[in-house]
Amino acid sequence: MIDKWVLGLFNRATYSRMKAFLDYCRDRKDIDLTIILGSSMLDKEYGEAGKELMQEYKDYEYICLPYKSYKSEQNRINLISADILKNAGEYLIQIKPTVVLAVADRFETLPFVTAAAYLNIPVAHVQGGEVSGNIDDKIRNACTKMSDYHFVTTDMSLKYLEAMGEEKSRIFNPGCTAIEYVKKNRIFRWDDKNLYFICMFHPDTKNLKEQLIHTEALLKSIVDFCFHKNCKCIWYWPNADRGREDIINLLRDWFEKYP
């Protein structure tokens, strides 16, 4: 008997977390996997990771949800969520999967899980029970309560889900699939002899008013450090949370001043 599984991927982070799982499913003849892509996975501004995924994993069926890059910061999350709820729900009705797999805590995950739950499709949630201290906690916990099976990454996460009232027999701890993939991957070596360091700074969804002050203070500190130590900084682009445009605009201004 072949099971129909549907995996929802809506940003590059969830894609990287599930690569080990995608490799595993390649060798399973009893699993028919369909991958639903949406949101920033299809956005040119964020590298169109969906194209990269479809090129690397040609064995699977793909559904690309209609996507609009809404510019309004206030309405963007609401509109994208509504699109996913409607469009993913329609495809799930057609596919009739055995189980739906949802990953982590991005806002796009919640409407995807909601669509499956209200269609009485079992939901398996990956990376529940974690704590980040921002709005992601609310999304993650809401997804947990609407899911039927839980695949956590740590013993502490497992205990959190038990404390939330989830059935122990439905909670599993396979570890972090992203780490498993890193262990299998080759070591990246850089021949450049110059000194570099990496900076990653994402929007603070609970403190948008002060995030530009924090960003500018961090930029000033990094420029001073690079000047005195004769090194350069590799700065990761902020993720697709509300407030990212303000950070991006500030970064571009500073990058022009200090290439």
Each predicted region: which residue ranges?
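Conserved nucleotide-sugar phosphate-binding/catalytic loop shared by glycosyltransferases and other
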Residues: 32-77
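Short internal beta-strands
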Residues: 33-40, 150, 232-239
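A nucleotide-sugar donor-handling region in carbohydrate enzymes
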Residues: 9, 41-45, 146-213
